[in-house]
């Protein structure tokens, strides 16, 4: 029994469930944690350096909203549905805004910010991200068009860390933990 399964079992027992129910919950938690990513999965994406989750700034629904990191909450704005765009390649659809993310045009700087944008109806036009599992279990998430990687950088004036795309340098700021989550458990 791995640590995650034990933790799920302990939490379930503390919440007053029966041993059978607790075992079932622990098994489902372990299954979700160890499974490969698939289209239609709902996930939260945590940056390894900062420990926070990917979301649109201030949970704003507007196109052009910067993508930032925020402390973990069971909120729809921090949860993404994986839409198939090829082998280990996905378009991310936010559960709260129903929009996706894409790098801003290169004219916005050397490491363009990642911003929220409307989800194109034509799948071929949807921004795609390649998820590459690393030896430590985290993921490198790269823009399919440029190959540049989602990277967290400190926010201006002490604000939330901002998300940009940058060449891969194997830094913690470029590594992401992807955890499946049941969207029925989300609030807001």
Model-inferred region functions:
Residues 1-8:
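Bacterial N-terminal signal peptides that target proteins for export
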Residues 8-16:
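Bacterial N-terminal signal peptides
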Residues 23-188:
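Lectin-like carbohydrate-binding module/patch detector with strong preference for beta-trefoil
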Residues 18-21:
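Sec/Tat signal peptide C-region and signal peptidase I cleavage site
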């Amino acid at each position: 029994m791995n640590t995650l399964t034990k933790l799920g079992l302990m939490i379930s027992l503390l919440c007053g469930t029966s041993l059978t129910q607790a075992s079932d919950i622990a098994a489902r938690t372990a299954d979700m944690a160890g499974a490969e990513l698939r289209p239609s999965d709902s996930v939260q994406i945590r940056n390894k350096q900062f420990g926070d989750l990917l979301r649109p700034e201030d949970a704003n629904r507007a196109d052009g909203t910067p993508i930032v990191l925020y402390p973990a909450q069971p909120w729809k704005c921090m949860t993404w549905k994986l839409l198939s765009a090829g082998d280990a390649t996905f378009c991310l659809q936010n559960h709260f805004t129903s929009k996706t993310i894409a790098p801003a045009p290169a004219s916005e700087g050397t490491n363009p910010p990642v911003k929220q944008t409307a989800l194109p109806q034509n799948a071929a036009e949807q921004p795609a991200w390649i998820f590459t599992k690393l030896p430590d279990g985290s993921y490198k998430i790269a823009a399919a068009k440029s190959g540049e990687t989602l990277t967290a950088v400190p926010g201006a004036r002490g604000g939330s860390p901002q998300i940009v795309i940058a060449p891969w340098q194997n830094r913690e700021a470029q590594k992401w933990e992807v955890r499946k989550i049941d969207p029925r458990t989300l609030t807001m």
